[in-house]
Amino acid sequence: MPHYGYSFEGFDPVVHVRASGREVNVSPKAAREIAVTIKGMTVAKAIDLLEGVEQMKVPIAFRRHKLKVGHRSELQGFPTGSYPVKAARAYLRVLHNLQGNAEFKGLDSERVEIIHAAGYAGRTIKDYVPRAMGRSSPNFHQLVHIELVGKEV
């Protein structure tokens, strides 16, 4: 079993609280865009936002991965956006873990602000699809590591 660290440096166990989801089967692009969106929010506000994404009522702005992504009239500043429901569910699980960890440490979970949010590449699942004439085509799938670090404000 591998031992995973965190990409956040300067972690203080008294002040900070953290949670992670390792090797989650979601899109790396959607995971990155959600991480950029929720960084700086309180945990309660981020949960409300992602529940809206899950119900396909609130779009997430796609800043980097925006080719062939439709425009959303609800977005301000960045016109391209989408509803990454699967990634939002994964982030909601990690956010609820972060909230529980904050309560366990004695922090006020309503005042915890997300100071570090990351969604980066994990392990690659390699699969091959058989084709005609004895050939095969690769069908690789990238897993994602999700990290959240919060601090009481």
Sequence positions of predicted segments:
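Extended, charged amphipathic interaction segments
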Residues: 109-132
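Short, solvent-exposed beta-edge and connector elements
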Residues: 26, 132-133
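Ribosome large-subunit tunnel/peptidyl-transferase-proximal elements
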Residues: 2-108, 149-150
